[in-house]
Every structure is written in structure tokens, then in C-alpha cells.
Amino acid sequence: MELVLKDAQSALEVSEATFGRDFNEALVHQVVVAYAANARQGTRAQKTRAEVTGSGKKPWRQKGTGRARAGTVKGPIWRGGGVTFAAKTQDHSQKVNKKMYRGALKSIFSELVRQDRLIVVESFGVEAPKTKELKAKLNEMQLEDVLIVTPEVDENLFLAARNLYKVDVRDVAGIDPVSLIAFNKVLVTAEAIKQIEEMLG
């Protein structure tokens, strides 16, 4: 299959296995959920009554004081006591096989092509790290909500895009399922398309 280059009167031959496969919604959902889960820190921690610092001594005698009976100062009903069901550090990560991850990315790219959300250009960049210059270039192409994918990190482009709302710049190694579906359009250079094909096999 072919992808038409927007800035040139030509087309790029690409693999149908990468850019023309059926959309597997269940797989994409599983991979996106796993990606989000793997980003969670899960480092919260509270102490149970067994872990709280304090004496194990009975605070006062059982009878005769007129106060409610108490056996410990570390109980959950005491100020500074332990938490009944204390939250502990958790690992929320979900395992995703390489084959599944690549399959999800192929599904997403194929769906982007079908929905005319994937824009392929011969090259894309700015001469200086100027937001104004990049904004003008994107306005010319009628792009606002866009992810720009380049073969390697372009520092000028990255710095120019940093202050633009709903514009992000990634190299091929930095793309992920969440960022690909989060933007309305995905702008990719021809060289980046070749690298994506190699990466996804």
C-alpha cells in the first residue's frame, strides 16, 4: 500500500501488515490500560497497629478509673494509632508481550490511516527554536492538536513545541500507544515511517 506525502507530489510504499491491518479494539484497550497501570508509582504506605511506634503497656488499669477500658495506645481509635486496613506499597504493573505491544501499535497506525489522521511529510523541522515559527508552519498545514514524530530528537523542534498547547514532539523510540491516540492528528516524516516499519517488523 502507499501513503501520500503531503509536502511532495509522490507516495511512500509501506507494508500493509503495519499500516493496513484490521483494528483490534480489545488488544489496543488491553495495551493502553497496561501502559497506564505501569506508569503508576504505587508508593503509598500507612502503618497498622503492629507497626506504629509506641508502648505495648496497658495505658491504665481495667477497672476503677471511670474511663473506658483500653488495652493499647496503638489501636485505630486512638489519635496517632495505626490504620485499620493500612494501604501498602503496591506493584500495579501488567505484563504485555512484545508481540501484543507491536500488534497494538500496528492496529493504531492502521486506524490512523483509515481515519485520515496520519499525515506523512518528506521532512519537518524549524531553523531556530522559535515557537512562533512552528506555530506558523502548523497553521499553514491547518494543524492544531498534533503529535509530531521525527526519526531522532530534533532539539529546535522540541523547544519550539514546548510552549504550544496540544502539540508534542517525539522521536520514533519515544512513541507509545497513549500518545498516538491522544492527539487528533499524527504528523510523521518519511524517514520516521521507515523506522517505524523496522521497529514493528
Swiss-Prot record:
The keyword Protease does not apply. InterPro entries: Ribosomal_uL4 (IPR002136), Ribosomal_uL4-like (IPR013005), Ribosomal_uL4_dom_sf (IPR023574). SUPFAM superfamilies: Ribosomal protein L4. NCBIfam families: rplD_bact. One of the primary rRNA binding proteins, this protein initially binds near the 5'-end of the 23S rRNA. It is important during the early stages of 50S assembly. It makes multiple contacts with different domains of the 23S rRNA in the assembled 50S subunit and ribosome. Forms part of the polypeptide exit tunnel. PANTHER family: 50S RIBOSOMAL PROTEIN L4 (PTHR10746), LARGE RIBOSOMAL SUBUNIT PROTEIN UL4M (PTHR10746:SF6). This is Large ribosomal subunit protein uL4.
